[in-house]
Amino acid sequence: MNVSVTAPAKAAVAPSCYDAVTIWLHWTIVVLVAAQWLGAELIDFADRPTHKLYWSIHITLGCLFAAVVIFHVIWRMTAGRKLPTSNEEGWKLATAAMHMLLYWIPLILALLGIGIVLARGWSLFGIVNIPMMPGGSRPLSREIHEIHEWTAHVLVFLATGHALAALYHRYALKDGVLRRMQFER
């Protein structure tokens, strides 16, 4: 009797990290948030001509930031790899809330930035003139700017908390969560 035994089929292994596009978008947003926040904090130390140049750079990077954030949200809703939460049951709601805030606040921040520019008008690098919207004014622009600035501080605070949570997973829990945002080797 000839009995043939085959090896059991390998079980499908769930991916342990996000896809490359998601990872690139994540780290691009991290760099843009850090650069934009730090630049905005230092911008008022510049002399007048340099000050206008720095604002033009901030506005340009803000437009790039808005585009990347919008693409990131669309990517995550459609093609991006979904991984299950690694947190215990009690932390799942907090994790979901943090991630929702980290998606929505950058969108709100970008819209506020656009509102600032449209409320007062701007000459971008002295080349492109963005006109003031009807009903716009410098006082309105300043009010929107105040909200934009506070929203940026909230984003940096939450992003710092997010980073600290990732480090907690890495060094205290040692559960491999931080590896999810590293490129596969």
PLM-predicted stretches and their roles:
Residues 1-185:
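Membrane-embedded alpha-helical bundles that constitute the cytochrome b-like, heme-associated redox core
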